[in-house]
Structures are given as C-alpha cells and as structure tokens.
Swiss-Prot record:
Protein name (record): Pyrimidine-specific ribonucleoside hydrolase RihB
HAMAP family: Pyrim_hydro_RihB
Tree of life domain: Bacteria
PANTHER family: INOSINE-URIDINE PREFERRING NUCLEOSIDE HYDROLASE (PTHR12304), URIDINE NUCLEOSIDASE (PTHR12304:SF4)
Quaternary structure, from the entry: Homotetramer.
Pfam hit, one: IU_nuc_hydro
Cofactor binding annotation: Binds 1 Ca(2+) ion per monomer.
EC number(s) from the headed UniProt entry: 3.2.2.8
Cofactor: Ca(2+)
The keyword Metal-binding appears for this protein: yes
Record has Membrane as a keyword: no
Provenance organism: Escherichia coli O17:K52:H18 (strain UMN026 / ExPEC)
Residues that, per the record, bind substrate: 227, 239
Length: 313
C-alpha cells in the first residue's frame, strides 16, 4: 500500500479539524506537516485551533503559521458558521503545544525543494500560503505531485451566489494556483455538500467513542446548530474531509476533468470558479473536479479514523 506524503494547509475550522483527525491517523496518509492560514477566522485563532486539535488527539506533527492576510483583498472571516474562535463548540484544556518558528511558506518551499517530487499539497482553506510559496520559489512547481484542494463550485457558491468561501477569501491566490500548471483536484461545493452530517452520523461516531469520537460530536453538533440558523438545514457538510477521503481512495469519488478559471474581476462573480463542464471553451482541462461521492463509503472511512484514536493498552 503506497503512502501518500502530504502537507495539509488549513484554516481550522470545524471541517478542517475532521480533516486533520483523518489525515493524521489513516495508514495510507503520511502527514508531514500542518500549515495554517487565515480564513474561517484570523490567523491567531486558526493557529490556536490547529494546535488544540493536535494536542487533544496527541497528533505529533509539526504545525506552522502562515499568511495572516489575503494577497490583495480585504480580509473576511466565516464567524457565522465557525463562531468567534473559529472552532466554537469543543472545550479544550490548557494549550501547551506550540507552533514551529519557521514560517509556513518557507516550510512548504524547503520541504518541496528537498523532495523527490512525491509530496501532495492539500489546501482546504484560502490558497494564500500556496500561492505565495509558488511566487517566492517557482522551482517548487515541478516538485508538487498534485494539489488536492477544497474550494470553489461549478454550481452556486455559499458565501456569495457565485463564490465559495475559500476561493472568495483570496481569489487572487486561487488564480495563481489554478494557472500554475500543477495537477489539480478540486473538491467543490457540488461534491462536498453531499457529505451531510446528520444527528444519526454524530450518534454513530459517539458510539465509537474515544477522544476523536468526542471531538467529532462536539464539532458537528455546533456545525448543525449554525447550519440550521444560517440555512435552515438539518445537517452540515464536512467539506474539507473529502480531500482526505480522495487521497485514501480516489475510487470513492467520481471526478470530471474540466478547464477551471478563477474570476478576479470586481463585481458579482468575484471569486467564482468558472468550470467549463461542457468543454465549450475548447481549452485543455487543468482540474479534476469532484462530481459525486459514495457517502456510505465516506462515513465508513471517517468512522475508521475515529476508531483509530481509541487506545487499546
């Protein structure tokens, strides 16, 4: 079984925490490092959240703080979904885990340059860290095996009618990534919204128990609350975790190759991922776009990872 070496770039975030939990435990994934970016909340908060998750689950992977601001646009956060801390719901003990002193962008560049081209980048927040790394050291581009990202949509957005939050939070960074020539896999809203976590799913993970079962329950109960308050929904998707699912077994997710372009023009479509689903532009595809996911398989995978945190001694 081949292990996928990855750097997980995230902005924790409730679904980010689920992605961290899965990536750190599944035997197919070799989680080299976690890089943090501003997104769901400001960088000081997303960093603390990432460290808290790692400490609670005893994940001994280095954590690096990255870009505190988007490349150009004014910063936005998703406090309506993720709360004042960015990870409201769970109660963590006193934090002793610390971030590394190296900046996330430098870590990404140095790690890729020293690699054999076998590292996959998994950005599940705004693409600020990845884009700045690409601009600072273009020689990393051929070193990236693949980028598997959560962001965008070929249908409607969730932060504006046109744009999904991660892309809208830094469209210029997304433009850099989507024009980089690196192989891209995009888990957009059309796919991730299929992973609706219901009270039944929460109860299933609670029955498994352990620290990850408890954390999953606390995270998703809060998510269900904000999803109902904001959208009237009885469940909440775990967007970012789909990227980890794809890396573990891409057969669980159907993709379609498309040409994708990020709209960086000011106006109602700012931050939209324009996906040429029908191929009408005649441009070569640059992205595998997620279409459907086997949800039974996916929740089984989540349960497998949750179960992995139960101590047997």
């Amino acid at each position: 079984m081949e292990k996928r070496k990855i750097i997980l770039d995230c902005d924790p975030g409730h679904d980010d925490a689920i992605a961290i939990m899965m990536a750190a435990k599944h035997p197919v994934i070799d989680l080299l490092g976690i890089t943090i970016v501003a997104g769901n909340q400001t960088l000081d908060k997303t960093l603390i959240n990432g460290l808290n998750v790692c400490q609670k689950l005893e994940i001994n992977v280095p954590v690096y703080a990255g870009m505190p601001q988007p490349i150009m646009r004014q910063q936005i956060v998703a406090d309506n979904i993720h709360g004042e801390t960015g990870l409201d719901g769970p109660v963590f003990g006193p934090l002793t885990r610390q971030a590394e002193s190296t900046h996330a962008v430098k870590y990404i560049i140095d790690t890729l340059m020293a690699s054999d081209g076998d590292i996959t980048l998994v950005p599940v927040g705004p693409l600020s860290n990845i884009a700045v790394a690409m601009r600072m050291q273009p020689a990393i581009l051929p070193k990236i095996r693949e980028i598997v990202l959560m962001g965008g949509a070929y249908g409607t957005g969730n932060f504006t009618p046109s744009a999904e939050f991660n892309i809208f939070a830094d469209p210029e960074a997304a433009r850099v990534v989507f024009t980089s020539g690196v192989p891209l896999v995009m888990m957009g809203l059309d796919l991730t919204n299929q992973t609706v976590c219901t009270p039944d799913v929460i109860a299933r993970m609670e029955r498994v128990g352990g620290p990850a079962g408890e954390l999953f329950s606390d995270i998703m109960n809060f998510t269900l609350k904000t999803q109902f308050e904001n959208y009237g929904l009885a469940g909440g998707p775990v967007h970012d975790a789909t990227c980890i699912g794809y890396l573990i077994n891409p057969d669980g997710i159907k993709t379609q190759e498309m040409y994708v372009e990020v709209d960086v023009n000011s106006g109602p479509c700012y931050g939209r991922t324009v996906c040429d689903e029908l191929g009408v532009l005649g441009k070569p595809a640059n992205t595998k776009v997620g279409i459907t996911i086997d949800t039974d398989w996916f929740w089984g995978l989540v349960e497998e990872c949750v179960r992995g945190y139960i101590k047997t001694h």
